[in-house]
């Protein structure tokens, strides 16, 4: 699955495939986030996501564009944070500083971190919920 040919295929095609139908991919992402939030709300369980919001087979190769990746990651992080069910939200699968292409835009990370940190947690997670209380204590 993770051969160099796979990465070359992603580099060659992924952005084009996304840009041909961005609304489709964005709606697919937000619909799945809303579905997970709905299930979490029904079960009164908090969500934490560390690997998220888009493509995972992307490398920090020279000249790769990150704007479309960042657009999807921003949409995913903000959508998740607004549900109130996520108590831990990563900005992307590439949020580690080893991804130079992603970290060129430090302000993007700061802005998303601010949105995530200021998003309220759903009240259903706070009342009489031992599981959520234990997790939230650790955060």
Which residues fall in each region the model found?
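Aromatic-rich peripheral "rim/lid" segments of glycoside hydrolase catalytic domains that contact
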Residues: 59-139
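Glycoside hydrolase catalytic-domain groove-lining segments
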Residues: 1-57
């Amino acid at each position: 699955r993770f051969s160099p040919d796979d990465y070359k295929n992603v580099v060659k095609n992924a952005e084009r495939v996304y840009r041909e139908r961005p609304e489709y991919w964005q709606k697919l992402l937000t619909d799945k986030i809303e579905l997970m939030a709905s299930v979490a709300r029904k079960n009164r369980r908090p969500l934490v996501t560390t690997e998220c919001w888009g493509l995972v087979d992307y490398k920090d190769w020279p000249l790769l564009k990150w704007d479309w990746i960042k657009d999807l990651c921003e949409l995913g992080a903000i959508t998740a944070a607004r549900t109130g069910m996520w108590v831990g939200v990563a900005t992307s699968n590439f949020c580690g500083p080893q991804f130079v292409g992603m970290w060129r835009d430090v302000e993007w990370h700061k802005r998303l971190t601010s949105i995530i940190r200021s998003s309220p947690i759903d009240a259903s997670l706070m009342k009489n919920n031992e599981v959520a209380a234990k997790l939230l204590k650790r955060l």
